[in-house]
Amino acid sequence: MGLAIVLASIAVRGQAASQSPGLQIIPQPKQLNALPEVFRFRRDNRILLANPGSDDDRFAAQDFIDDLKASAGVAVVISKGRLHRGILVGRIDLPQIREVLRQAGLEVPTTLNTEGYVLIVGADQVIVAGKTEAGTFYGLQTLKQLVRGEGADAFIPAVKIVDWPTMRWRAVSDDISRGPVPTVDYIKRQIRTEAFFKMNMHSFYMEHTFASESNPLIGPTGGSLTPAEIRELVAYARRYHVELVPEQQTFGHLHKALRLEKYADLAETPDGDVLSPQQPGSYKLIADWYQELNELFPGQFFHIGADETFELGEGQSKAEAQAKGVGAIYFEHLNRVREVLKPYNRRLMFWGDIALHHPDLIGNVPKDMIVMNWQYGAADDYSSYLKPFKDAGLDQFVCPGAHNWNQIFPNLEAATKNIVNFVRDGQRAGAIGMMNTTWDDDGEALFESAWYPIVLGASASWQEGAVDIQEFDRDFDWSFFRSDGNEFVKAERALGSVPSLLNAGTTDELFWREPFGNQFINETRNLAERTHHMRRIVEDVAESVAKNENRARRNHSAVAAMLFAAQRYDHLGRRMEVVQKFSDEYWNAYLNLGDRVKVRKLRYYTGAIYNNLREMAEELSILKENYRRQWLAENRPYWLDSVLARYDQAIAMWLAKSRQIDEALRKYELSSTLPGPEEFGLGTRPSVPIPNR
C-alpha cells in the first residue's frame, strides 16, 4: 500500500485524543490516526537523513538506533542515497520532506509549533519530520514507543501523528543540596529519560553544592557539582534538547554557607539560613556565584530561589521591617538581585510563595521575571494561586511536586492530584511552563523511586487539559518499562497509597521513630488492622515485582527501587506488629508475675534461635546494605554515611532491647519480679483485655 493510504482523515484535531487500541504513547499525541497495516523491519533497514549535514538529526537518529537495538534487538543503520524502504528523518522545511508530505496530501497545521513533529508510518516507509531539530527528536521518541515485538518479529503499526507541546517549558527540579548529590552518569540518565518523555529543562537546586572557585569553602568536597562536570553535562543535555538551569539560592536556605565563620556576618539571624539584605557582602556573594554560573550555563534562565525566607525581619533587618514591612524588604531584595545579574541578560526565575503572602506588593516584581509558583497540596482547583500573578502580567511556571520528600516511596495519591490539576489550571491561566519538583528534605530520598510522578508531569505539560489517569496508567508499563500488561504500574500505585493508608504524613519519620514509647505503641494499636492490610499490599508488590522484573526492557533500575520500597514498608509494618505484641505480652507477664508460663513467653524476645527483637536488627542490616547499593547506583558517596548511621543506631537499639529483656528474665528467675513496663518504654496498660497467647 502507498503512503497516501496512511493519511486518512483525523477525527480529532487540535486537542488531545484518546489513543487507538494497542497504541501506548506517553505523552499522548495531539492528533493520531491508526491503520491496520504495519511496517516490518528487514535486514536492509535504513535511516536516511534529509539533511546529512545536521549533527542534531544524526544524533537523534543514532539515539533511536541504539534504543531499538537495546530494547527490541533490531539493527538499523544510517545510510545515504534515495530511500525506497526505511525511515526518513528531517525538518519539515527540507525539500525532500516537503515533497514526501506533498505527495501524501498532508498539510502541516498552523498550530504546529517549533517543537512539533509529523510522524507517518506506512508499509514501506516511515517519515519523521520536525518543525525544528527538536521536533524531529521528539518524533523519534514517539517512534521508540511505537515499535512492537522483538528481533525478526519487530514491527511498527501504521499510523499518522501530528503532535506538538501545549506548554513551552517542561521541567524537572532536582534537589541536590539536602543529602543525595547524583553522579554525572546518573544525571545523564535523568536527562535521557526526561527527554524520552519530551521534557526540555532540568534544574539543579543548589544551596551549597556548587563548587565555586571564588568561594571554595562553601561547596563540600565530593558533594558538589564542579565546573568541569557542569560543562560536560551542558554539552550532553544540549544533544537531547534539554536546557540545564542553575538554581543557586540567593536569599533563604543558605544555612550551610552562613554557618561558616567567614560568612556568619551575612546571616539575617545568628546561625540562621537567610542572607541579610542589610549586608553589602550578601550581594557580593551572589555576584561571585552567578559570575561563575554565567560562564558555565549558556541558557536563557537563572533561577534565584528566594523561597521560605522565614527569618527575614527578625535580625539585622528588624528595624527596617518594622518601618516599612517585611514584604517591602523582600521585593527590594529581588530587585537588587536583578540589578546584580542584569549584565548577563537572563530571565530570572524566583519561587512565588513569599509574593503570595504579600499580594498587594506583587506589582513591584519586574515584568521580565518569572514566578515559579509552587503548590503541593492535593487540591481540586488552583486558580486562586494563579490569578494574582496572571493579573499582575507576570509569566509563571506551575510547580507541582513528586511528593517524594520524607517518604519511603512517593505519595502518589497526593502527587497525582497535585500534578494533574495544577498543570491543567496553569494551562488555563496561560502559564508558560511546568517544573515538577523533587525534594530530599531528610536526606535519604532516592530519585529512582520518583519516575512515575516525573513522567506524569511530562504528560500533563505536553498534553492539553487534564491527563486521564486511567489512560496514563494503561500506557505506563509499555512506555516506561517496555513491558506489556500493567503489573508495574499496579505496584507503583499500591506503594504510592501507603501514606494515606497509614494516615502518615511522612513515612520516613514513622520508619525511624523511636518504637519504645507511649506515642508509638499506642499508635500501633490504633493502626493494627491497617498495618496488617499494608503488609499484605506491599508483600504482594514485592512478589509481583520479583516475578515480573525481567520483563522490563527499559528503566530496570526503577524496578529495584520499587522492590526496596516494598521491603522497607514491610519491615515498618512488622516492626509495628512486633512492638505491639511485645508490649501486650510484657504487660500480660507483669500483671501475672505468679504465672511463670506467661512470663517465660518473653523468651521469644531474647532467645538464640527465635528472637523477635534481634530479627528486627537482622532485617535492618539487610535493608541497610540494599539502601547502600541503591544510593551508590545514583549518588556520590558523599552524605551516605549520615543515612547509614540511622540504620546502625536502630540496629543497636534493637539488640540492646533484647539484652535488656534477657537480663530482666534472669533476675525474674531469682526474685519473681519484673521491671515496670515503663522502664522498657512499652506504653500504657492496654485498655482491652490481653488475649492469652
Regions found by a protein language model. Name each.
Residues 52-53, 178, 377:
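A generic structural motif
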